[in-house]
């Protein structure tokens, strides 16, 4: 299969010295898998609706540093300043992705735009929108995420980035369905007829945040030329305001659902907000043998955060302070070593996060990657303290968690093989029990994982496979599938005098029997439950995806199993069934236009075409 060779590179505000190649425009799995939860290497579990609360089904370590509110169920759908790509080219760039399901209220839109102006100034914008009514009563998800910024280089020594981002998450909360025993019966007229556990249809989640960030880089020594050592100072200041709210003002029919959290029969409300001001100052030195790919980076700095917290009805303010360090050695495509460290000071004494990654290429023999992450961090806010309707539900004195993760990956691109072994060890693990209450384990939690991917090509046919295995020593506190498989079998070839690229076939996924977590909308948390067990369920999608130049189109019929089995539902979250079979389509196109004469001067740190490496941060969605 031919690759898209457009010389399109991008960088990030915190490290403009390093460039990365942009995604291609092939009609591949990432294109046709429109749902962010299914774009992950192993699918995340959701509430069955596009844009709904989600969590990993293969355990993942969440990097932590200082204060954390503990609200992460919607992270897949958000945009933040650190994620904004600035495209390093002399042409205007725009890309749009749109997908729609059965109705006009089942759609999503992703859009990117970038332009370089005279003098090297660069503007970049990302926008995401999800508006999905859902198949069941009162489960609509409506999200908007926006991030835009300006990159302003002055001469060869200064780079300034101003970025603004805003996320608004809205989810109607129906509590899941009461029973699925009516599925397939004569009186069942479709998912909309299923009774839900919050029948008043008044419970609503709204999470909103906005961030304004200014990053400035000043080079004291060295310049933009190749092979010169640079000494640079970087200052970043970011202000963030966040408001998280759940409310249900109609408890006449909904009171039974809330159980532990029913503090006031007139209505339930959980509200918290905070203002956060982050300041970081970093001194770094690096040298680039090839522009856009520094061969070594060494940096040290301080990071301070001031937080003004309103956890209704209590107000508080406090600070976090960390010493930071980074070392990166990438002398060639065949070797990369990255080490990062963060050490807590003053009130954060005893907290830390240390990570390292080694990447070695052996040519045709393959590639080896290995990494480690060790961190000690305090409980997130909602593990520590919770108010519901201004009444204290809990205030815990939990110990700080200590987490160590280690992985090794061997890849042999020649035969499309990649194998990863990973282990996690967590002391003082925190979770939410069957009542949705915060709990801490007294004994360590250990998880072992093995993931293998094999992509096979036989003429025009492709067979792509990912199989993941995981096992923990504490099935009483962590309940995830022991195995997961996702596979694609399809035809891939060019038609109509090689003008049209066609991929057509089936996507398949299945996981082992497990007890999926329940979801508590009051706290926006997944928690243990004992009432439902999900057995292996064959999820089959039929698809066709096309590409003509930079225009792409897909159509797919999802969950074909419901064509012949109308009585069985599958769950990734207890009482929230995945949708029945339905058709979905999507389109995407990319434009690259030359700017006006005199407007194509790239920023001073612009790398030449074909520089950059695939090692490093990538977009999330």
Task: Please tell me what each predicted stretch does.
Residues 2-90:
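Acidic, small-polar-rich N-terminal luminal/periplasmic segments of exported/outer-membrane proteins
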Residues 136-137, 173-176, 380-385:
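Short acidic, glycine/serine/threonine-rich loops at helix termini
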Residues 89-91, 96, 206-251, 263-621:
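Exposed, low-structure sequence patches enriched in small/polar residues
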Residues 159-217, 244-252, 272, 375-377:
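Flexible loop and strand-edge segments within Gram-negative outer membrane beta-barrel domains
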Residues 67-69, 81-86, 90-112, 134:
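Short strand-turn segments of transmembrane beta-barrel domains in outer membranes
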Residues 101, 118, 126-132, 155, ...:
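An acidic- and aromatic-residue-enriched active-site/binding cleft used to recognize and process polar
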Residues 107-129, 138-170:
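Transmembrane beta-barrel wall of Gram-negative outer-membrane proteins
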Residues 257-262:
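N-terminal low-complexity tails
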């Amino acid at each position: 299969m031919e690759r898209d060779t457009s010389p399109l590179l991008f960088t990030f505000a915190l490290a403009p010295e390093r460039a990365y190649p942009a995604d291609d425009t092939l009609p591949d799995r990432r294109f046709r898998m429109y749902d962010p939860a299914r774009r992950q290497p192993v699918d995340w579990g959701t509430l069955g609706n596009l844009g709904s609360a989600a969590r990993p089904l293969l355990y993942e370590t969440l990097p932590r540093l200082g204060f954390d509110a503990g609200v992460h169920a919607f992270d897949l759908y958000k945009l933040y300043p650190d994620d904004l790509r600035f495209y390093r080219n002399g042409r205007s760039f725009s890309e749009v992705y749109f997908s729609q399901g059965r109705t006009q209220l089942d759609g999503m839109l992703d859009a990117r735009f970038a332009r370089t102006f005279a003098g090297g100034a660069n503007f970049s914008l990302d926008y995401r929108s999800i508006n999905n009514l859902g198949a069941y009563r009162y489960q609509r998800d409506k999200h908007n995420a926006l991030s835009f910024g300006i990159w302003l280089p002055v001469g060869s020594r200064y780079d300034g980035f101003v970025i603004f981002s805003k996320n608004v998450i809205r989810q109607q909360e129906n509590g899941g369905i009461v029973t699925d025993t009516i599925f397939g019966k004569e009186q069942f007229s479709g998912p909309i007829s299923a009774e839900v556990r919050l029948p008043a249809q008044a419970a609503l989640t709204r999470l909103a945040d906005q961030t304004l960030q200014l990053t400035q880089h000043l080079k004291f020594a060295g310049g933009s030329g190749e092979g010169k050592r640079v000494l640079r100072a970087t200052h970043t200041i970011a202000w963030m305001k966040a408001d998280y709210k759940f409310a249900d003002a109609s408890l006449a029919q909904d009171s039974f659902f809330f159980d532990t959290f029913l503090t006031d029969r007139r209505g339930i409300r959980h509200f918290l907000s905070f203002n956060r001001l982050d300041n970081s100052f970093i001194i770094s030195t690096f040298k680039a043998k090839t522009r856009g790919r520094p061969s070594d980076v060494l940096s040290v700095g301080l990071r301070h955060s001031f937080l003004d917290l309103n956890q209704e009805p209590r107000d508080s303010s406090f600070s976090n302070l960390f010493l930071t360090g980074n070392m990166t050695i990438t002398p060639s495509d065949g070797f990369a070593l990255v080490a990062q460290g963060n050490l807590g000071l003053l009130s954060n004494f005893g907290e830390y996060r240390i990570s390292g990654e080694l990447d070695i290429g052996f040519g045709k023999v393959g590639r080896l990657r290995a990494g480690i992450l060790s961190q000690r961090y305090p409980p997130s806010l909602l593990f520590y303290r919770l108010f519901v309707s201004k009444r204290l539900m809990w205030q815990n004195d939990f110990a700080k968690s200590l987490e160590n993760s280690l992985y090794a990956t061997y890849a042999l691109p020649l035969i499309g093989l990649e194998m990863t072994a990973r282990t996690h060890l967590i002391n003082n693990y925190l979770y939410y029990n069957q009542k949705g209450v915060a709990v801490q384990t007294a004994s360590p939690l250990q998880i072992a994982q093995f993931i293998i991917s094999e992509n096979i090509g036989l003429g025009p046919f492709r067979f792509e496979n990912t199989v993941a295995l995981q096992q923990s020593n504490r099935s009483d506190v962590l309940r995830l599938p022991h195995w997961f498989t996702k596979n694609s079998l399809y035809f891939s070839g060019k038609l109509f005098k090689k003008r049209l690229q066609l991929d057509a076939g089936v996507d398949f996924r299945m996981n082992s029997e497990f007890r999926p977590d329940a979801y508590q909308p009051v706290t926006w948390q997944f928690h243990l439950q004992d009432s439902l067990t999900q057995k292996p369920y064959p999820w089959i999608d039929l698809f066709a995806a096309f590409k003509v130049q930079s225009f792409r189109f897909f159509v797919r019929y999802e969950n074909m199993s419901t064509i012949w089995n109308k009585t069985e539902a599958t769950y990734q979250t207890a009482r929230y069934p995945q949708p029945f079979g339905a058709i979905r389509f999507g389109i995407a196109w990319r434009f690259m236009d030359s700017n006006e004469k005199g407007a194509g001067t790239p920023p001073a740190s612009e790398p030449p075409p074909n520089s950059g490496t695939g090692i490093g941060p990538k977009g999330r969605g």
